[in-house]
Amino acid sequence: VKAFMEKEIFPHEDFVDKSGVVPDDLGRQIEKKAKEAGLYSANMPENIGGGGLSKKAISLIEREYGKTSHALHSWIGRPTEILLACVGDQISNYLQPCVTGEKRELFALSEPGAGSDVMGMKSNARRDGADWILNGSKHFISGPCMPDFAIVFAVTGLDDTKRGPRKRITAFLVDVGTRGFEISEGNKSVSYRGYKTFQLSFNDVRLGPDQVLGEEGNGLELAGKWLGMGRIWVGACCCGKAERIIGLANEW
């Protein structure tokens, strides 16, 4: 991983930092080299084409990734493990293409006015026969490039609990290009130059029952599995950043 970073990533840092963009051809080059090196989808199970590395191993890799621009290392590719909840045709339509790099996904949770506070979420989906009708918006949804689909979290009802009503959150697989689904690039990142954010809006988007990821109402549980480990990887990235800047300071 260190050799890959020094050869394929570090040489492009100055350009990305000054220009604020990662040209698509450069991103695809990094993606291709990552696949050849066996780094792409290293976090996913071997039986579906991933690297099958342990969480500890991935954390060590993330520490190395943290030594460079997020905009560059995100092209190496680490599909969200939430997609492991795919079943039936979802596996061939979403999971496997993400593992091979044919498709890219977005994790769409944060909203205007609510941020990542899921209990403040306003995006909602109501039943219409066997289908769902999705409405709402998401922002600050990040990724290296325009995605092929988004994993969208929306309120699908209320559950009575001992602490009072609790929003029932469900995850949906929503393809870019679906009628009523609009996506555009959002605000530029100050510290993550070249890393894209997207704004998503949903206006009466009709989704079939096969576009529910996992079970209706278990969106929070799905999100928690990924976010919990993701926080560890963020910490590993931060350690890598600190390690590199100390090294650069010593050299200077």
Regions found by a protein language model. Name each.
Residues E182-W252:
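Glycine-rich beta->alpha junctions and the first turn(s) of the following alpha-helix
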Residues E13-V21, N250-E251:
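C-terminal helix-coil-helix/basic helical segment that borders enzyme active sites and/or dimer interfaces
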Residues N135-I183:
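A short core secondary-structure module
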Residues C98, G113-S116, F140-G143, K162-R163, ...:
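Short Gly/Pro-enriched turn/cap motifs at secondary-structure boundaries
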Residues S123-R126:
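A structural signal for short hydrophobic beta-strand segments in well-ordered beta-sheet cores
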Residues G52-E64, D117-M121, S201, L207:
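Structural signature of FAD isoalloxazine-binding scaffolds in flavoprotein oxidoreductases
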Residues G101-L109, F153:
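A short, Trp-centered hydrophobic/proline-enriched beta-strand micro-motif
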